[in-house]
Amino acid sequence: MVRRRAQEVSAVTDQPACPPAMDLAPASGSRGLHVITWGCQMNVYDSARMTDVLRPLGYHPVDTPDTADMVILNTCHIRDRAAEKVFSELGRLRLVKEARATEGQQTVLAVAGCVAQAEGKEILARAPFVDIVLGPQTYHRLPEMVARAARAAGAVIDTDFPAEQKFDFLPDAQAPQSPGGITSFLTIQEGCDKFCSFCVVPYTRGAEASRPVASVLREARRMVECGAREITLLGQNVNAYHGEGPDGRVWGLARLAEALAAIPGLARIRYTTSHPRDMDADLIAAHRDLPALMPFLHLPVQSGSDRILDAMNRGHTAADYRDLVLRLRDARPDIALSSDFIVGHPGETDADFEATLQLIRDVGFAQAFSFKYSPRPGTPAAGAPLQVAEDVKDARLQALQALLRTQQDAFNDGTVGHVVPVLFTGHGRKAGQLSGRSPYLQPVHVEGPDSLIGQIANVEIRERYTNSLSGTLVQERAFA
């Protein structure tokens, strides 16, 4: 049986009004901005920040590229054939740009994100109609790039890793990233120093860098003032956070989480993505001591084979991961885990794959993401010998996902008949239905009053579906 806490720390119902700067209605004569976002939660956050930094230039969000004076395509380099997907989308946007040009309207087209960082020159060679190419570390320079693009005959490209940190120059966040602002993402760390053999992140996002504590707390308070009840802290390697604190010392993620938990109105804190090597004793203790820190942790392991973990340059063994899980569960018995797995890394044998399946059986995951290995140009694994055949990778992925699906179903089954605190974020698909999330990020649907949106209330889970739960309210009002 899955153990549950029936209540969480819940903030006062009355939230302070969102500051006047949040008046985001477009001014007369303003210009439309359409942002297309692919990839991770950090890209969602980055897109919001690019929107913020362009507001002083008169740009406001619009729903379609056809009505936009500027279009930003914020890209992701993680998936296979990521660059080709970008060029396909750029072909569509070229038609939009040309159609607007026939009507005497200009469209500034920008490509941002990790594909822009990795393929900047190739983008301009194959898509010369693109006006701006910028990497993830130069968003604070976007207004300057727009001005340069207006003056220049050619495109502007900025994919440097500048000495200054962009967060020192970006304005405070202006808009939440979800309808109603009940949940928000907050980037606190970027880059990675681990150099896993399969991963492009160190090359596209750069070295690990952390925002100062004061900057993080200021933005978090603003999010809460604007209605956020839950904040997810983001970073490529978020538990490596080492920001400068107001006391002049370096703060780790545990100390930052403690400070965030003290913000009135912030009921839930999450963080992603973590590396096992940076899950220190202080952070484990924070899961024990901070009720606002949700008992659901995404902790990628990638493989259960020590030989493959070494080939991946993960810096830990399968036994290290198992021991870490035991320490987490000892500190927080109700914690649940999700993870990432890659099948078919170069050199992976049947025995290596079986070791991964055994680790999954031993640990037990509430959720997981799994992928076939695909080479990323410039990474060590791309040129490694003993590449695994595609049909073998397909079979292994199918077997692994079947095991993970069984575990996810079992975890969700364990909630049926139990009372779970649910943060309601909006309406469900059916009339009179509300939708929210459990502490374990499970979607939960109930019938209830709109007054519960933005609040936490107890729900008795009655039924489990493939990817969601349904139940009935135990109480008709939020608890404090």
UniProtKB/Swiss-Prot annotation:
Keywords: 4Fe-4S, Cytoplasm, Iron, Iron-sulfur, Metal-binding, S-adenosyl-L-methionine, Transferase, tRNA processing
Bound cofactor: record note: Binds 2 [4Fe-4S] clusters. One cluster is coordinated with 3 cysteines and an exchangeable S-adenosyl-L-methionine.
Domain Radical SAM core, chain residue ranges per copy: 178-410
Domain of life assignment: Bacteria
Segments forming domain MTTase N-terminal: 31-151
Domain TRAM: 413-475
Subcellular location: Cytoplasm
InterPro entries in the record: Elp3/MiaA/NifB-like_rSAM (IPR006638), Methylthiotransferase (IPR005839), Methylthiotransferase_CS (IPR020612), Methylthiotransferase_N (IPR013848), Methylthiotransferase_N_sf (IPR038135), MiaB_methiolase (IPR006463), rSAM (IPR007197), rSAM_horseshoe (IPR023404)
Positions annotated to bind [4Fe-4S] cluster 1: 40, 76, 114
Catalytic activity: N(6)-dimethylallyladenosine(37) in tRNA + (sulfur carrier)-SH + AH2 + 2 S-adenosyl-L-methionine = 2-methylsulfanyl-N(6)-dimethylallyladenosine(37) in tRNA + (sulfur carrier)-H + 5'-deoxyadenosine + L-methionine + A + S-adenosyl-L-homocysteine + 2 H(+)
GO terms under cellular component: cytosol
EC number of this enzyme: 2.8.4.3
SUPFAM superfamilies membership: Radical SAM enzymes
Molecular function GO terms recorded: 4 iron, 4 sulfur cluster binding; metal ion binding; N6-isopentenyladenosine methylthiotransferase activity
Binding positions for [4Fe-4S] cluster 2 per the UniProt entry: 192, 196, 199
Cofactors, names only: [4Fe-4S] cluster
Function according to Swiss-Prot or TrEMBL: Catalyzes the methylthiolation of N6-(dimethylallyl)adenosine (i(6)A), leading to the formation of 2-methylthio-N6-(dimethylallyl)adenosine (ms(2)i(6)A) at position 37 in tRNAs that read codons beginning with uridine.
Family: Belongs to the methylthiotransferase family. MiaB subfamily.
NCBIfam families (UniProt xref): miaB-methiolase, MiaB/RimO family radical SAM methylthiotransferase
Subunit structure: Monomer.
PANTHER family associated with the record: CDK5 REGULATORY SUBUNIT-ASSOCIATED PROTEIN 1 (PTHR43020), MITOCHONDRIAL TRNA METHYLTHIOTRANSFERASE CDK5RAP1 (PTHR43020:SF2)
Name assigned to this protein: tRNA-2-methylthio-N(6)-dimethylallyladenosine synthase
Source species: Gluconacetobacter diazotrophicus (strain ATCC 49037 / DSM 5601 / CCUG 37298 / CIP 103539 / LMG 7603 / PAl5)
